[in-house]
Amino acid sequence: MKCGDTVTLNELLEQYNIKEVNKLNLGWSKDEKLILIDKNNNKYMLRISDKSLYDKRYRQYKLLKEVSKFNINCPKPMDFGELDDKLYMLLTYLEGNRAEEEIIKYSNTEQYNLGLEAGKILKIIHSYDKESDTLTWWEKYEPKSIRKINTYLDSELKHNDYEFLINYYKENIHLMKNRPQILTHGDFHLGNMLIHENHIVVIDFDKMNFADPYDEFKPYCWNVLRSEYFETGLINGYFDNKIPDDFFKLLKFYTIESLISHLPWAMTFGEEEVKTAYMIYDKVIEWYDNFKLEIPTWYKGVL
């Protein structure tokens, strides 16, 4: 069978000599995830998606094939096609412990060094230059920003200083003009990493797209809540200790954007996610000293 062929699950399992199938229940994706083990005890990840996602998943498959040529620890795509009435993508399965749980077992120096490694991996991913989007970042970003503001203002729940958030966002949205675009992981944080033999493994490229490289740092809160040293190392590793003058100003803007979009999103998932959204807001207030700081308090500088 060739890549792109339609197969049944049994045919696929037979083709790869699979002897064991286990379901994996992790992450927010609606994809079904199966861990496959073949007769030689090689492991694979089988992602099963709705057929309506064909264009997105096929593009993801092709981009992953390009990224996998880099010397980084990430899943390698093996096969892609239609599986019964759905889509499948077969990837190598990488061993490791969940980084968000494992990171706190390391010393501050070790956490920082793992962050350095993650930052260097991210820089390598961003070095892909064989393809780009036809639309500019601003052309994609501006319509989304209008929807985010309207959704937030129409939301039943808001932050106490929501007017400040909206005004700051509107006053600084010009920063999004003329931003470069590169290939991004799309959700680069500890929740999508493993640690194996004291090294970072990057997984779950489900949100891979072309975006402003600084947009990649937007989910930093999930790192900082586990390790300020890891996030500091990630930034320093990415920039080789030479932080651009505009980085923290843009990171603050993206932080405000995240606060505006997080709460309405959380409301669709229930009370616990709403509590998390408010907790993140309180932390951001603390890290930015009520938004008086440009550089958040968790950043440790070059160590």
Regions found by a protein language model. Give the residues of each.
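A general structural signal marking secondary-structure boundaries and capping sites
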Residues: 68-71, 81, 97-98, 122-130, ...
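ATP-binding pocket architecture of kinase catalytic cores
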Residues: 23-136
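Glycine-rich, phosphate-binding/catalytic loops in enzymes
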Residues: 64, 107-108, 201, 218-220
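Short beta-strand segments
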Residues: 45-48, 78, 183-186, 202-204, ...
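Active-site activation/catalytic loop segments of kinase-like enzymes and analogous catalytic loops
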Residues: 214-244, 255-272, 279-284
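Active-site acidic catalytic loop and adjacent metal/ATP-binding pocket
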Residues: 32-37, 167-217
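Conserved N-terminal boundary motif of the eukaryotic protein kinase catalytic domain
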Residues: 15-24
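An alpha-helical support segment within catalytic cores of ATP-dependent transferases
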Residues: 4-15, 116, 127-186, 236, ...
